[in-house]
C-alpha cells in the first residue's frame, strides 16, 4: 500500500520539489546523482517508468490514489511517499490543471553517448539551440511518429525532460533515444559515424526534400535550428547538404516543429 501523506498547506516543504524548485534547480548540475525531473500525467509517468526511470515521490489528487493512479503506484516501491491534498491546495500549483491530477518526481537517468544513441540508427534528428520546451516536445512526438530513430541536441537548447517538453511530447521523450552533442565541431562526430548531414535552411543551393541524394542516404541526420534565426552559418557550412521545404503564397518558413514534421515524414517515414 502506498505511503499516503496528506498536505494541508501549500507552503509545506514537502511540496518544494513540485511547487518551488525551478527546472534548473532540479537538474542540479553540481550534484548529478541527485538530479531530478518532474513527469506529469498518468501517460507520461507510465512511459517514464517503462523507460526505467526511478520515482522518488508522487503528488496526486486523492481520488487518483485508488483510481487511475493505482496501477502506476502498483509498479513502484510501496514505501514511496505519495503526497495528496485538497483541490483547493493543489490548484495553487501553477499549471496543475494540465497535469491530469498526477505528478511524479523522478531521478534523472544517466545519458548515453552519441555513438550509443546512434548505434543502428538510419535516420536521426539534430536540434541546434531549440529553446522552447513546447517545440522540443512537439519535435520528439513527430520523431517517434515519423521514422526518426534518435534525437541529438546541443546543450544550449531546452531540456527534453523539462515538464512542458515531456508533457507536449506525450511521453515520447522516453521512447526516442536521445542525448546531448559534444561541444565544438559535432558535425565531424556525425560524419565519423557515417551520417550524411542535411541542414534545414533557405539557401539558393538548397535541395528539395524529395531529392534522391537525401532519400537514398544510408544514414541521414536532419539538422534543425533555433526558433527565429534558424541554423548558424557555421553549422550550415559544415553540413553535406542544405535542404528546403517548398512553400506557396510567399511563405518562406515554418515553425521549427512544423518543419520537423514535414521533413521527418519525407526523409524518415517515407524512406522506411
Where does each model-flagged region fall?
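Structured adenosyl-cofactor binding patch, chiefly the S-adenosyl-L-methionine
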Residues: 102-104, 142-146, 157-172, 233-272
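Active-site/ligand-binding-proximal alpha/beta "capping" segment
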Residues: 198-251
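RNA substrate-binding interface of SAM-dependent RNA methyltransferases
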Residues: 5, 107-205
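Short beta->alpha connector loops at strand-helix junctions that form conserved
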Residues: 85-86, 128, 154-155, 177, ...
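Short, aromatic/basic amphipathic alpha-helical patches
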Residues: 67-79, 235
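Boundary-proximal intrinsically disordered activation/regulatory segments immediately upstream
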Residues: 1-71, 157-158
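Short acidic-hydrophobic, aromatic-tinged amphipathic segments that line or gate anion-handling sites
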Residues: 4-10, 81-86, 176-186, 243
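A glycine-rich helix N-cap at a beta->alpha junction
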Residues: 75-95
Amino acid at each position: 500500500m502506498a505511503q499516503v501523506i496528506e498536505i494541508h498547506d501549500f507552503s509545506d516543504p514537502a511540496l518544494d520539489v513540485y511547487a518551488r524548485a525551478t527546472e534548473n534547480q532540479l537538474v542540479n548540475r553540481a550534484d548529478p546523482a541527485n538530479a531530478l525531473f518532474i513527469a506529469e500525467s498518468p501517460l507520461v509517468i507510465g512511459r517514464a517508468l517503462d523507460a526505467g526511470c526511478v520515482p522518488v515521490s508522487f503528488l496526486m489528487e486523492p481520488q487518483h490514489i485508488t483510481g487511475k493512479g493505482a496501477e502506476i503506484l502498483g509498479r513502484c516501491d510501496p514505501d514511496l511517499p505519495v503526497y495528496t491534498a485538497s483541490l483547493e491546495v493543489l490548484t495553487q500549483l501553477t499549471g496543475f490543471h494540465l497535469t491530469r491530477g498526477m505528478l511524479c518526481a523522478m531521478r534523472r537517468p544517466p545519458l548515453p553517448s552519441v555513438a550509443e544513441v546512434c548505434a543502428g540508427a538510419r535516420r536521426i534528428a539534430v536540434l541546434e539551440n531549440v529553446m522552447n520546451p513546447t517545440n522540443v516536445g512537439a519535435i520528439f512526438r513527430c520523431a517517434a511518429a515519423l521514422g526518426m530513430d534518435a534525437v541529438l541536441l546541443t546543450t544550449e537548447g531546452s531540456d527534453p525532460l523539462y515538464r512542458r517538453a515531456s508533457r507536449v511530447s506525450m511521453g515520447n521523450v522516453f521512447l526516442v533515444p536521445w542525448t546531448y552533442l559534444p561541444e565544438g565541431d559535432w558535425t565531424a562526430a556525425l560524419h565519423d559515424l557515417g551520417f550524411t548531414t542535411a541542414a534545414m535552411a533557405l539557401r539558393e543551393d538548397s535541395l528539395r526534400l524529395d531529392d534522391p541524394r537525401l532519400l537514398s542516404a544510408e544514414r541521414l541526420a536532419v539538422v534543425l535550428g533555433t526558433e527565429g534565426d534558424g541554423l548558424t552559418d557555421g553549422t550550415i557550412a559544415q553540413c553535406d547538404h542544405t535542404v528546403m521545404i517548398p512553400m506557396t503564397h510567399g511563405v518562406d518558413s515554418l515553425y521549427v516543429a512544423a518543419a520537423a514534421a514535414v521533413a521527418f515524414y519525407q526523409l524518415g517515414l517515407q524512406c522506411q
